[in-house]
């Protein structure tokens, strides 16, 4: 068993060996290395054909038409293109956008930029379970609302939004619906023929594909228009200029094909491992799951261990590669804004750890993790005066602390 054990699949996944093997055929002189836009020779034709195959593989994953897939550098770019692209194109119709407080920074910061440009954004509060209540969503919709941007699966707490119901609501109100599916594409079944999603962001490295590649699904019927954010040679039907990275696109396509074929068996395994991990630690006193436990992606377990300081817990768990928030904000010592939005205290948010399980996690690794967690929590609490006070029956919420 290799240490540290990787329990951070929500931050990134290793490239599946089958994907890496396929990508190797599209880089060197003895492979297919041509520019897919070169129409005058075989090198270009072969590369273009490889891109077409991959485009169909990504489309098949969500049951879309291959012409609805636009390749990007990843979900961050897809989110930017979707949100800014819609806002700029439809601004004469209205300048109001709805999103939630628990979105990824790639959505929140894009919305903040649009606010600086004169758009109005409503940031919805989730319920205590991390899910946006439908009535709260409907109440925020106005005549000048042009876009709703909402994640399918939350990257920190793994809760799943009902995009079928939300899509129906948006369609009935004439509001464009963008879904950030970075954490769900390739993990949960998605069918855009049934679900009324207009735009969907997809990430390669979250589903065992390479980093630096993603896609944006753009619905053709009813047609969704975007204003391009990247100008140049007019690639990707004018929506995203830039030479297509054949090897990465092939990697994304292969990862999508594998995800579609293995989704059911992968999820059954991951679900069993998640339950094994939770059953091994749930009896530790003052241990709580953050986010809805039922309406949740099975590979995510976000747990707060009360009366344990987050950073010391991370150090105690040095043999486990885990995180205390999203990878994009893990350098910050601030408590997770997602957990704060759920109403957790700073202390509880600070004592939370996200365990994310994936395709290559084993039972042996989960059992090893349980042992380390049980031992570490006990040791850290022995050193905590707060734990001692709590055990003595002191109500810590009523204690007045003196600042020196």
Curated annotation (Swiss-Prot):
Residues annotated as transmembrane: none
Residue sites binding pyridoxal 5'-phosphate per the record: 75-76, 155, 183, 203-205, 243
EC number, UniProt record: 2.8.1.7
GO CC entries: L-cysteine desulfurase complex
Positions annotated to bind [2Fe-2S] cluster: 328
Modified sites of kind N6-(pyridoxal phosphate)lysine: 206
Gene Ontology MF, one: metal ion binding
Pfam families hit by this protein: Aminotran_5
Catalytic activity: (sulfur carrier)-H + L-cysteine = (sulfur carrier)-SH + L-alanine
InterPro entries noted in UniProt: Aminotrans_V_dom, Aminotrans_V_PyrdxlP_BS, Cys_deSase_IscS, Cysteine_dSase, PyrdxlP-dep_Trfase, PyrdxlP-dep_Trfase_major, PyrdxlP-dep_Trfase_small
BP GO annotations: [2Fe-2S] cluster assembly
Record flagged with keyword Cell inner membrane: no
Pathway: Cofactor biosynthesis; iron-sulfur cluster biosynthesis
Intracellular or extracellular location(s): Cytoplasm
Cofactors (names): pyridoxal 5'-phosphate
Principal location listed in the UniProt entry: cytoplasm
Active site: residue positions: 328
Sequence similarity: Belongs to the class-V pyridoxal-phosphate-dependent aminotransferase family. NifS/IscS subfamily.
PANTHER family recorded: CYSTEINE DESULFURASE (PTHR11601:SF34), CYSTEINE DESULFURYLASE FAMILY MEMBER (PTHR11601)
Subunit composition and interactions: Homodimer. Forms a heterotetramer with IscU, interacts with other sulfur acceptors.
Alphabetical list of NCBIfam families matching this protein: IscS, PRK14012.1
Function as written in the Swiss-Prot or TrEMBL entry: Master enzyme that delivers sulfur to a number of partners involved in Fe-S cluster assembly, tRNA modification or cofactor biosynthesis. Catalyzes the removal of elemental sulfur atoms from cysteine to produce alanine. Functions as a sulfur delivery protein for Fe-S cluster synthesis onto IscU, an Fe-S scaffold assembly protein, as well as other S acceptor proteins.
Name of this protein: Cysteine desulfurase IscS
Organism field: Shewanella amazonensis (strain ATCC BAA-1098 / SB2B)
Lineage, top ranks: Bacteria, Pseudomonadati, Pseudomonadota, Gammaproteobacteria, Alteromonadales
């Amino acid at each position: 068993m290799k240490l540290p054990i990787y329990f951070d699949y929500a931050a990134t996944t290793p490239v599946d060996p089958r994907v890496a093997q396929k990508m190797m055929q599209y880089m060197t002189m003895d492979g297919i290395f041509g520019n897919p836009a070169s129409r005058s020779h075989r090198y270009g034709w072969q590369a273009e054909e490889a891109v077409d195959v991959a485009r169909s593989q990504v489309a098949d994953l969500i049951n879309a038409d291959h012409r609805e897939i636009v390749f990007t550098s990843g979900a961050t770019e897809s989110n930017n293109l979707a949100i800014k692209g819609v806002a700029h194109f439809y601004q004469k119709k209205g300048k109001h956008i709805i999103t939630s407080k628990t979105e990824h920074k790639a959505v929140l910061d894009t919305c903040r930029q649009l606010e600086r440009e004169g758009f109005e954004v409503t940031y919805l509060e989730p319920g205590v379970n991390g899910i946006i209540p439908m009535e709260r969503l409907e109440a925020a919709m106005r005549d000048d609302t042009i876009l709703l941007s909402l994640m399918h699966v939350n990257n920190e707490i793994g809760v799943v939004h009902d995009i079928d119901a939300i899509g129906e609501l948006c369609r009935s109100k004439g509001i464009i619906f963008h879904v950030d599916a970075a954490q769900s594409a390739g993990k949960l079944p998605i069918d855009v023929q049934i679900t009324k999603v207009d735009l969907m962001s997809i990430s390669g490295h979250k589903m065992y594909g390479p980093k630096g590649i993603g896609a944006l699904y753009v619905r053709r019927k009813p047609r969704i228009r975007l204003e391009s954010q990247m100008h140049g040679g007019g690639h990707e039907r004018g929506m995203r200029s830039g030479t297509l990275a054949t090897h990465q696109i092939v990697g994304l396509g292969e990862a999508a094909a594998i995800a579609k074929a293995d989704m059911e068996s992968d999820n059954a395994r991951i679900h069993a491992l998640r339950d094994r991990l939770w059953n091994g630690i749930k009896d530790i006193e003052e241990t709580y799951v953050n986010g809805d436990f039922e309406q949740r992606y099975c590979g995510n377990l976000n747990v707060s261990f009360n009366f344990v300081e987050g950073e010391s817990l991370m150090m105690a768990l040095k043999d486990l590669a885990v995180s205390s928030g999203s990878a994009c904000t893990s350098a910050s010592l601030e408590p997770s804004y997602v957990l704060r939005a759920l109403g957790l205290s700073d202390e509880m948010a600070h004592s939370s750890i996200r365990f994310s399980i994936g395709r290559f996690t084993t039972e042996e690794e989960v059992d090893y993790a349980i042992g380390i967690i049980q031992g570490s929590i006990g040791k850290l609490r022995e050193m905590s005066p707060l734990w001692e006070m709590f055990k003595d029956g002191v109500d810590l919420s009523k204690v007045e602390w003196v600042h020196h």
